[in-house]
Amino acid sequence: MNVVKHTKYIWELEDFISEGEIEYLLGMFNFYNPTIVESFRNKDRENDTYIITDHPDLDAMAWKWVNAANEYYVKENQFIFYNWQKDLMFAPSDSNTTTWRGQNIIRMYNESDSYEWHGDQSPTNHAEFSYIIYLNDDFDGGATRFMNDKLTITPKKGTVLCFPVDHYHIHKGVKVSGGHKKILWNCVYRHEIEMIAKQPYLTATNVPRSSKRCIW
């Protein structure tokens, strides 16, 4: 593995996942053939989105990658301020320890597909870190571009792109000019600060959200 630190917070973990593992996951994806989320695609979010939580084998393999990337990124990044208990945050899960949660999503971009400027978020949970895993690189275009850092990341198969979920790291998926782009995405949160809308704040879930936001 090679770690590229573009900024304090935007990291690439190159060669983090082997080609064999990726091909195995893509084979499982084709076998299970998850249902496409038809409602996700619009003029700002041009991609085919699949939620894979209904397929335990597929989801477990994705979590293996996401958990490993998350543990490395959080523990090794000195600018992520959990220094007093980082090890505890990755202890075996039980009712007294931190558990990271999220939702594994596979996105397929066809030729001319793109994803306009957006910030990653969840409508109900306080997501902290976003992970984009590039499942292939045999396509043209399709880079990930960050607005404020004026940074463009070229997808590389087996690489994990890591960055915080906040209002600074606005990014986009550049148009795919040839071929098909495939990614696995998850933005994770800690269950002990999970935010569930309850009365008298239930109306908060009905507040209009920008279509340019990435929601689960």
Name each region found by the language model.
Residues 1-160, 168-216:
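Fe(II)/2-oxoglutarate oxygenase catalytic core
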